[in-house]
């Protein structure tokens, strides 16, 4: 119940951050500064990059809402992620960063905006009686640690290439080179309250591996809710804005139930088993639950050629593979141009696939209303007849 309440609060904060400042203040009045600040600190910790300061320090976040001041200290040191400092942590506070609560809400969860100044206050060595005595030991660490924490306080678009390395997901730099394509097709969704489903959380049967790409999408879509589906229990990957579900991507009933609970989705990414039958089942079950204007993505098309995944090394025998599915969508796009006596009855994909972008091992399928209309029947289908009809009778 507490987890559900927290998830609801996160969604409310995201919604308010995209509205007027008054919406944020009403939310804070309802839930209290402490509860809202807890959500914000959790987000900052998850977004902050790996610290580089070799001298451990504390950075104090002081979040103000009217007369209330909520201080939270973060421990920052090379070799470990940024974390909340324990109550008895007596480390050196190198910097105090003060935000207005409604301003920090909008910085973290509102539509991305560029503001070079005027968003926060800072105090170097806030509790030291004399700063000069600490310069040699803590000055550089203060600068580095503050930069790390402030990097977690922004919604500026991150570098997907860097995120793949940070979160240990092979979407760029090793097996694949997907991130430039993802950046191109996903950037327009960054400021929206998206719901992203990724099939396949990673780590196979290891109980503590996987979840890197979910964290990457959480960081990239700073206003989004991220869902991961896997045949194995990957609940260790759950955190604020990330939900994992145990299920079989080859079970249409499971997928329909998942979509009914968490959809409709703005984006679905199939990075699951890569077994061709599973890819096709997932598409047919989930594409109807992608909202108009959304995207369905299929990774690792190479398995279409591998018999061990249900593929076929002969490209001419690809009908039952993932690539066979992608190729069929070209006909779906053009279905209104087929002769009326073709005997083809338009299916769901025919009516709703409006764009197709295929790269090496990666396909993006755009969802919409595919009913622009075909070339009218009174237009001649024969070249010579078309020329004659279009020439006004001129010989």
Swiss-Prot record:
One of its GO terms (molecular function) is demethylmacrocin O-methyltransferase activity. Keywords: Antibiotic biosynthesis, Methyltransferase, S-adenosyl-L-methionine, Transferase. Its EC number is 2.1.1.102. Gene3D superfamilies: 3.30.1050.30, Vaccinia Virus protein VP39 (3.40.50.150). It catalyses: demethylmacrocin + S-adenosyl-L-methionine = macrocin + S-adenosyl-L-homocysteine + H(+). GO terms for biological process: antibiotic biosynthetic process; methylation. Pathway: Antibiotic biosynthesis; tylosin biosynthesis. The lineage of its organism: Bacteria, Bacillati, Actinomycetota, Actinomycetes, Kitasatosporales. Disruption phenotype: No production of demethylmacrocin. This is Demethylmacrocin O-methyltransferase. Optimum pH is 7.8-8.5. It comes from Streptomyces fradiae. O-methyltransferase that catalyzes the conversion of demethylmacrocin to macrocin, the penultimate step of tylosin antibiotic biosynthesis. Also able to mediate the conversion of demethyllactenocin to lactenocin. The keyword Acetylation does not apply. It comes from the Bacteria.
